[in-house]
């Protein structure tokens, strides 16, 4: 997605809650970064600092009963 902003932007922060361990893959214009996220009662906050126009986020969890919720992205861009 370009999140409705059709210009280059930087993903500075990504927060997500998960009750079990997962892997989060973030793609920016085809460039991939992977993060191991531990499950817990508080949201995990990742600092990907990825620049691009289009982003894709993938969640991989292999445990039974995994819950992934409340993703929060922080983007920076300039007009």
Functional labels for PLM-detected ranges:
Residues 1-79:
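Beta-sheet repeat architectures centered on beta-propellers
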């Amino acid at each position: 997605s370009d999140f409705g902003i059709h210009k280059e932007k930087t993903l500075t922060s990504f927060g997500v809650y998960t009750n079990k361990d997962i892997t989060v893959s973030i793609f920016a214009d085809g460039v991939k970064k992977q993060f191991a996220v531990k499950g817990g009662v508080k949201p995990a906050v990742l600092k990907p600092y990825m620049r691009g126009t289009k982003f894709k986020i993938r969640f991989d969890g292999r445990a039974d009963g995994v819950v992934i919720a409340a993703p929060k992205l922080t983007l920076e861009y300039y007009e």
